[in-house]
Amino acid sequence: MIALIQRVSSASVTVEGNIIGEIDKGLLILLGVEQGDDEQKATRLCERVLGYRIFADDDGKMNLNVRQAGGNVLVVSQFTLVADTQRGMRPGFSRGADPSEADRLYQYFVEQCREQGVHTETGQFAADMKVALVNDGPVTFWLQT
């Protein structure tokens, strides 16, 4: 399971012209689910993402996690994160989880975020989404379990 996390001042996701998820300060989490991923990996990745210290403390050092910084999260499914890009000019997606399993684990990840007490907004699994963000920094990290 892969999470591309971006520290944002704001972010939103739109489907068919309607904003379905929106946050101010926090993390935009683009989530990719691979074959072999399970609830244990999703739980571990959620703990890492929510505990990752990428917000500035009073001394300006990256020393606070999203909870300590009073931030929110917006979780958006993105199967292209699991693409095989090693050869050729076209990505392959054979490493991606079956769509029904990917959706289940995506929803599980979202619930884990909520159970950790973080306000969590979402995109819509498998929809054509428009994601807007103001990247703060920019600060972007790739986490994988």
Swiss-Prot record:
Subunit record text: Homodimer.
Name this polypeptide is given: D-aminoacyl-tRNA deacylase
Recorded catalytic reaction(s): these are: glycyl-tRNA(Ala) + H2O = tRNA(Ala) + glycine + H(+); a D-aminoacyl-tRNA + H2O = a tRNA + a D-alpha-amino acid + H(+)
Question: Could you tell me which HAMAP family the record lists for this protein?
Answer: Deacylase_Dtd
Family the entry assigns: Belongs to the DTD family.
EC id: 3.1.1.96
Q: Where in the cell is it found?
A: Cytoplasm
EC primary class: hydrolase
Q: Chief location of this protein? A: cytoplasm
Q: Name one GO biological process term.
A: D-amino acid catabolic process
Domain of life of the source: Bacteria
Which source organism does the UniProt entry give? Pectobacterium atrosepticum (strain SCRI 1043 / ATCC BAA-672) (Erwinia carotovora subsp. atroseptica)
Cited function = An aminoacyl-tRNA editing enzyme that deacylates mischarged D-aminoacyl-tRNAs. Also deacylates mischarged glycyl-tRNA(Ala), protecting cells against glycine mischarging by AlaRS. Acts via tRNA-based rather than protein-based catalysis; rejects L-amino acids rather than detecting D-amino acids in the active site. By recycling D-aminoacyl-tRNA to D-amino acids and free tRNA molecules, this enzyme counteracts the toxicity associated with the formation of D-aminoacyl-tRNA entities in vivo and helps enforce protein L-homochirality.
Q: What InterPro entries does the record point to?
A: Daa-tRNA_deacyls_DTD, DTD-like_sf
